[in-house]
A protein has these predicted regions:
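Terminal, low-structured helical/coil segments at or just beyond the last alpha-helical repeat
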Residues: 210-222, 274, 281-285, 289-323
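Flexible helix-coil transition and linker loops at the boundaries of alpha-helical arrays
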Residues: 59-74, 107-123, 188-201, 266-274
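Canonical tetratricopeptide repeat
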Residues: 69-72, 76, 83, 117, ...
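Residue-level recognition of tetratricopeptide repeat
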Residues: 29, 62, 112, 125, ...
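Structural motif corresponding to the intra-repeat A-B loop/turn of tetratricopeptide repeats
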Residues: 43, 91-92, 132, 139, ...
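N-terminal leader/linker segments that initiate helical-solenoid repeat arrays
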Residues: 2, 21-96, 100, 323
Length: 323
């Protein structure tokens, strides 16, 4: 509902009271025009705002004797601008047009010193930009979604839902540094909310773990360690430990590889033998590198499932493990 309507009844009574008094002739036009504006408001006529602005202009020409009429007019001008912006968004679903109207409303709220309309307009703009960001996200236009999120954060830097959504859009753009900065800022602002913190940590951990796994697959081992270390900043993950073990084995850092493979096993203790095979394979590889042949043979035996079967067999043959 428009804020103007909340003031309408009081205005109408005030105008009626003014008309019963004795006014100088030069106020007659302002009074009549004011009453016309009230009638236009009652009829939802969009010309009402122009009428009240004319009232203000006439009162400024008259001077002090018309300040009472002017003060009543300026109480509704920002509200009427807000009503237009509100209807464009909520009724007509015209996001861009509503945002343009909202910017004009903010200027009117500042001009006529109406903090309530300013606050309401900012909230309306946040709704509009949120809708815009969501639409861009659905069509995978993540760069435009980020710009919409930035517009919200320019209005309210502490709008945490937008910080989270911006992080997701940056993830979609694969902008690691910007994603990390945004998700870290979000986490700093939601301290105490365990559910949201856990959710955000998982998003960040998964992003950097997957990126680290890709670097590992591409044999970019230093990059992989950097990315996996970033992932570990956001909590423990059994698959993260597996990736660490794999990278460290390739780097021949067998102690670190064995430690991480064992951590993965410990976290995934309830997994099936097939799902444990990857940890055992990396553990066996590390143990072989450390010269712990007997332990390596046992671990590689436990790794003989699925995609690790042939590789584990090959290592056992090379180690001359008992059959």
């Amino acid at each position: 509902m428009s804020l103007a309507y909340k003031k309408f009844a009081a205005l109408f009574v005030l105008v009626a009271g003014l008309c019963m008094g004795t006014f100088a002739q030069d106020k007659t036009e302002a009074i009549n025009l004011f009453n016309q504006g009230v009638e236009q408001m009652k009829a939802n006529d969009p010309n009402a705002v122009n009428t009240f602005e004319k009232v203000v202009a006439i009162c400024d020409q008259i001077g002090d004797s018309a300040q009472d009429v002017k003060s009543k007019a300026i109480t509704v001008i920002p509200d009427l601008y807000y009503k237009k912006a509100y209807n464009l968004l909520m009724t007509d679903k015209k996001v861009n047009e509503s945002l343009q109207a909202s910017k004009t409303t903010l200027a009117m709220a500042d001009k006529y010193q109406d903090p309530n309309v300013k606050e309401s307009t900012q909230k309306l703009m946040i709704q509009a930009y949120t809708s815009m960001a969501a639409n861009y996200g659905q069509t995978k236009e993540y760069d435009k979604a980020v710009l919409a999120c930035d517009s919200i954060l320019a209005i309210n830097p502490d709008h945490t839902p937008t910080l989270y959504n911006k992080a997701l859009m940056l993830r979609g753009l694969d902008k690691g540094p910007e994603f990390e900065q945004t998700i870290d800022l979000y986490l700093s602002k939601i301290q105490g909310d365990a559910a949201k913190t856990e959710q955000a940590n998982k998003v960040a951990r998964d992003y950097f773990r997957v990126a680290g796994g890709k670097a590992n697959k591409d044999n970019k081992l230093n990059d992989a360690v950097t990315l996996l270390t970033k992932a570990s900043k956001y909590g423990e993950d059994n698959n993260l430990y597996y990736q660490f073990a794999s990278v460290y084995n390739k780097q021949k850092k067998f102690e670190l590889a064995a430690t991480n493979a064992q951590k993965g096993l410990d976290m995934d203790a309830a997994a099936t033998p097939e799902n444990k095979a990857k940890y055992y394979y990396e553990l066996g590889t590390a143990q072989a590198g450390l010269g712990k042949t007997s332990d390596a043979c046992q671990s590689l035996t436990n790794a003989m499932y699925g995609p690790f079967l042939n590789a584990a067999k090959g290592q056992k043959t090379n180690l001359k493990c008992p059959q």
